[in-house]
């Protein structure tokens, strides 16, 4: 197959005529070669500056030590707006930047609650702010959580984990977060009675509580309450990078890559289904039985695609099994492609469904949707005989995987 035209954007105009494809280029630029080159040069320069500007927008500087606490008015999960003035009575104010999805932040939640309990009577207030743009978080970054960073799901986490501190949302504009400059979650900023920044950094020196040797936040609070200088004023911050709005383009590119993945379907006989149920993959296996004519199956299918994209980089796999008849394979594949289901997809190989149903699960009567989660030893640890509760299913998956292999 012949190669495409080659354009050489160097040398003087006449030299271009010697290059293959030059007639096309000549038609585009005419005789004004110098003008064309100048335009091309400024286009390249402009693109470089644009990209540099986008990068700079993501490199938000952290608030310097000694700076005053930036003011804020942000909505809380408790239904009210909170301002900096609401904490005016505190001797010391801790501003914690945290979020739902980050496993590091999750590790610290119980410790933060205990710090609030231990220091509340001493005049210390703590407020948590979620700094991430939810639309700048990729699905695979949700692999260690059941919840995303939306305001609605912040409310769920705060309630389920009984947060004893205000949890505020800044994901729409990130204006407050940009004023403080958290580099990751969790990141704490500690202000004295005059609301001057006295400490910025990590809560302690390890997300694993059994490995903690230095309690930076507690040591800072003790020192400030005693009228002393904190022993440490700044540390590195280990955690999930703050998801500034500029990362939306990365998410878009990621979703386009997922959409381009091939989608196939294979026929499954009784032997295939017995092997599917046995599960010798070494992974947790989520299996969903469905059909194109099943309205609840169709309605919930997007949830399964999302769940697979969240967890597939861990010890997890998702398999769909259509109980449509073999002669309906074309419509099954069309549906799967429309849903971008690039996971493993199977279709009953025979219209004799009862034998195939029994091969997978003799206790299953054949109604769809039917969903099971199988552990690496082949035991069904979660079963749903009707439409799934997406949150409950995510939690079952998370619990099982984290107990087996915590982050």
Regions found by a protein language model. Give the residues of each.
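Short pre-active-site segment immediately N-terminal to redox-active cysteine/selenocysteine motifs
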Residues: 91-93, 98-101, 283-285, 290-293, ...
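Thiol-based oxidoreductase modules, predominantly thioredoxin-like and allied folds used
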Residues: 123-148, 163-173, 315-329, 341-352
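Bacterial N-terminal signal peptides
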Residues: 42-52
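A short beta-strand-turn-helix
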Residues: 72-93, 265-285, 305-310
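Conserved redox-active cysteine motifs that mediate thiol-disulfide chemistry
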Residues: 99-111, 289-306
């Amino acid at each position: 197959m012949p190669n495409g035209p080659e354009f050489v954007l160097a040398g003087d105009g006449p030299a271009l005529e010697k290059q293959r494809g030059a007639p096309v280029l000549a038609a585009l630029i005419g005789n004004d070669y110098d003008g064309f080159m100048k335009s091309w040069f400024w286009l390249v320069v402009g693109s470089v500056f644009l990209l540099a500007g986008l990068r700079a927008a993501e490199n938000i500087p952290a608030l310097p030590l000694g700076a005053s606490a930036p003011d804020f008015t942000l909505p809380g999960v408790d239904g009210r707006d909170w301002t900096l003035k609401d904490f005016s009575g505190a001797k010391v104010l801790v501003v914690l930047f945290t979020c739902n999805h980050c496993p590091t932040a999750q590790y610290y939640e119980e410790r933060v609650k205990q710090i609030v309990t231990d220091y509340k009577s001493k005049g210390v207030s703590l407020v948590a702010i979620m700094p991430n743009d939810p639309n700048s978080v990729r699905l695979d970054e949700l692999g260690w959580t059941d919840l995303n960073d939306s305001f609605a799901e912040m409310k769920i986490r705060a309630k389920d984990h009984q947060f004893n501190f205000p949890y505020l949302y800044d994901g729409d504009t990130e204006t407050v977060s940009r004023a403080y400059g958290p580099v990751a979650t969790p990141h704490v900023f500690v202000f004295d009675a005059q609301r001057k920044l006295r400490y910025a950094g990590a809560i302690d020196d390890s997300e694993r509580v059994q490995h903690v040797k230095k309690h930076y936040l507690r040591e800072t609070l003790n020192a400030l309450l005693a009228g002393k200088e904190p022993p440490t004023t700044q540390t590195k911050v280990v955690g999930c990078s703050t998801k500034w709005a500029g990362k939306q383009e990365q998410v878009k590119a990621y979703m386009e890559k997922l959409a381009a993945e091939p989608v196939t379907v294979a026929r499954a006989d009784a032997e295939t289904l017995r092997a599917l149920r046995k599960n010798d993959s070494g992974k947790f296996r989520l299996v969903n039985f469905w059909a194109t004519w099943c309205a609840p199956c169709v309605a919930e299918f997007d949830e399964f695609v999302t769940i697979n994209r969240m967890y597939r980089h861990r010890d997890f796999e998702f398999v769909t099994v259509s109980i449509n008849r073999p002669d309906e394979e074309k419509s099954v594949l069309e549906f799967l492609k429309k849903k971008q289901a690039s996971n493993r997809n199977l279709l009953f190989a025979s219209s004799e469904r009862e034998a195939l149903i029994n091969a997978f699960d003799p206790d299953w009567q054949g109604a769809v949707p039917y969903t099971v989660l199988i552990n690496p030893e082949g035991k069904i640890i979660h079963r749903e005989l009707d439409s799934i509760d997406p949150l409950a299913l995510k939690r079952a998956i998370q619990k099982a995987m984290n107990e087996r292999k915590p982050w």
